[in-house]
Amino acid sequence: MALMQISQFQRLVENMIFVRFFASVFFVLAIVLPLQTSFAESLINGDAVLWKIEGQGAEESYIYGTLNSSDRRIVDAGAYAHTLLRNADYLMVDILDDDAIKQKLFSVMLYNDNRRLRDLVSPETFEKIKVIGYEYGYLARQMNVLKPWAARVVFSSPPSEASRISLGIRTLNQTFQDIANEQGIDIVPLQTIEEQLQIADALNEADQIALLDTLPAEIQTVEGIYQTRINNFLSQSSGALYQEVLDEISVLSPEAQAKYMESLVFNRNRQMVSRMEEALRKGNSLTVIDAIHLPGQQGVLKLLQDKGFTITPVK
C-alpha cells in the first residue's frame, strides 16, 4: 500500500472514537435466549446512568455509564461525575486511552491479504459505503481495504462527530482520564486494547457483513440515529441505549446473537467486574464505562449485586 494511503488511513483511525466501535455496533441486549425473551425482565437497572456502589464495609464508590461522544451536551452531562472523580482515589475505565491504541487498531482493521470489501458485500451495500464514506472524506479505494467490522466503525458516528474529534475536541470518556492525569488520580484499566481487538478480529465475517448491509443509504439517517442515541443518554436511560443495539443486530439469527452476546457482552462484563472488585472493596473510586454495560440480568450492576454490593441510582 502506498505511503500516502497509509497516512490517510492513519488519519481515518485518529478521527474515530475507538470505544464507540463496541458501544454502537456490538454491545447488545444481554439475553442468550431468542428475542421473545421478556424485554423488561432483561433490562433491570436500565433507568439511570450514575450509580452509587456500597458494601463490604468500604467507603462508597460510583459507577458512571457513558456515551463516548464529544457533543457538548454529552460532555456537560458528565459535570457531576467529574466532581465525584476529583474527590476519588481511583478512576476505573474500560480501556486506557493513549496513542498506542490508534496504531494497534490500525494494524488489525485492514486486510493484509488479497481480499477486498467490494468483493465481500453486495453491490448495493458497497454503493452505500462509497456514498456515505464520501461524506467523511474517504474514497472508495480507501474503504475497500477495510474489514467489514472496521467499515462499520467508520460509520458508527456521524461526520459531525468525526470532525470534532479531528479538531482535538475531547470525548466524555477522555475528559475523565484528563482530570485523573491532571490530579494524579490512579487510573485502573479494566481491559486491554489487545483483548478488545482479539474479540473484534475473531467475529464471524458473514455476521459482520450482515450488519454492514443494514447501513443507511443517506447520511441524514446516520445523523438522526446518532441524535436519538444522544437523547436517550441525556434522559439517563441505559435501557433505551441497550434496546437501540438490540434492534440493530436483530438481522442476525438467534444463534449468532447468542454468540455475540457471550463474546462481546457477557464475558466482558464478567471480566470487568472481576477486575474492579479490588478497588471497590477499597472504596472511594469512580468507574467510567459505556452505559450499555450497566443494565440486564448479566449487566455489570447485577453482577456487582450478586457479589454482595448494594447499588443505588443517582439522579
Q: Language-model features: where?
A:
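Bacterial N-terminal signal peptides that target proteins for export
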Residues: 6-25
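Bacterial N-terminal signal peptides
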Residues: 23-34
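Short secondary-structure boundary/capping elements
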Residues: 45, 76, 267-271
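A cross-kingdom marker for long, charged
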Residues: 258-315
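Sec/Tat signal peptide C-region and signal peptidase I cleavage site
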Residues: 35-40
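Residue-level marker for the onset of beta-strands and adjacent loop->beta junctions
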Residues: 47-49, 274
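Structured, acidic catalytic/metal-binding patches in enzyme active sites
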Residues: 41, 49-260
